[in-house]
Amino acid sequence: RVLQMYSDPAVREKEIKNMSQVYTTLKKDILPEHRRARFIANIEFTNYTNEELVALVNDNIEILDEEALLRAATLLKENDAKLTIYNKAIDKFNSDRAIINKAVVLLNMNNIADATSVLAQTADKNCPFYQNSLGVIALRNGDLAKAEAAFAKANIDAAKANLGVVNILKGEYQAALNMLKGTQSFNEALANILTNNLDAASNILKDAKCPC
């Protein structure tokens, strides 16, 4: 009855405690059982701001978990700083995502050999992002067949756009345009030029989203 009379949990608990002073059985046998259930959902979660994350990377990186480390890396511009964070995530958590992202950073630094070596450490070889990065390395090495197979297996938007690049290199311009459509990239503009859609190419070049 007490549980129904009071909607405020604090008031309800106070009244139950008052009852327990009168009813010894209630206090000894029933209340302890219900009390234990209260702590199961008592979870604390620290959600750092971007500024706090960057500060912690510099001052106390050891307290950051895998998710915080990966997020922190996206906030930094310098490749060396990103590599430091990804190395920490790899060392502490054996993070596949950190391994793949480290390989991407190395590719952006045009260090293909090290990127290849790092990417090979990925445990889940079926991961779409692993396959996409594998395709990029193959493309950089001029192996179009291997790149095409990896991008097809990845089956994500980035890989689809990369397949468009493969199609351009193979001279399959309409197929490239189909793959690149909607990316608003320089590659989409190029595919439009190669298929004689000059007005479309001009419009894309006005506000292309990436330097690719």
Model-derived regions, located:
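N-terminal targeting segments with Sec-dependent signals, encompassing both cleavable signal peptides
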Residues: 1-212
